[in-house]
């Protein structure tokens, strides 16, 4: 099983990153994709991936929250980092019109620029979309023919949005959000509609600790070692064997991010 979304650069892991990776391995997690969300954290993610060769890889990009930082120098840094062997996708990039920490115009500019970098380098994109689906799809679609793959990280949308993502060929990342009985029920009902070869799994650690995890960790911090729990729950709600689902989603991740 492969965790495609871990924020291992987070300060929440500052005291015990090595142990977090060890616990993930002990839990049966076969690989981790470390998320880059701005130039500085993308560089940190790259260094962490290099510290765990053949187990950790990373993305390089600028999250929509940080899109106001986007300029030529940042673009050059992302382009340069993308040439590292351990950097396997451009992102986390996209649109987030929920909080608008950067203006919609700044977000669209940074998103389009990162899609152009990914197309130039023929790299997959690691995508973020929140409360921006129509504009997200309209900006992304013209680039899809030039991209080897596009992954919607932490998908939490509705059936119409899922169908639209699948229709243009996107791969869907599912987190422990689906384990939340308060806000994950709609997403849970959509799980059987995601083709197995288009499904990826992720913790988004240290965020989104599964609410149905027992016993709950005292820290309330999510970790990649909890990925098996998420996979078991997804498999149950899809009517599939958990071991098989862990294997197929692992194969999907390795194919999409070209880790073979």
From Swiss-Prot:
Residue numbers binding a divalent metal cation: 92, 128, 153
Compartment annotation: Cytoplasm
GO molecular-function term, one example from the UniProt record: magnesium ion binding
EC number: 3.1.11.-, 3.1.13.-
Major localisation: cytoplasm
Cofactor or coenzyme needed: Mg(2+)
Signal peptide, first to last residue: none
GO cellular component, one term: cytosol
Keyword field contains Phosphoprotein: no
Keywords: Cytoplasm, Exonuclease, Hydrolase, Magnesium, Metal-binding, Nuclease
EC supergroup of this enzyme: hydrolase
Coiled coil start-end: none
Listed Pfam families: TatD_DNase
Family matches, as InterPro entries: DNase_TatD-rel_CS (IPR018228), Exonuc_TatD (IPR024918), Metal_Hydrolase (IPR032466), TatD-like (IPR001130)
Function: 3'-5' exonuclease that prefers single-stranded DNA and RNA. May play a role in the H(2)O(2)-induced DNA damage repair.
HAMAP family tied to this protein: TatD_exonuclease
Family: Belongs to the metallo-dependent hydrolases superfamily. TatD-type hydrolase family. TatD subfamily.
Subunit structure as annotated in this protein's UniProt entry: Monomer.
Name of this protein: 3'-5' ssDNA/RNA exonuclease TatD
Gene source species: Pectobacterium parmentieri (strain WPP163)
Lineage of source species: Bacteria, Pseudomonadati, Pseudomonadota, Gammaproteobacteria, Enterobacterales
Gene expressing this chain: tatD
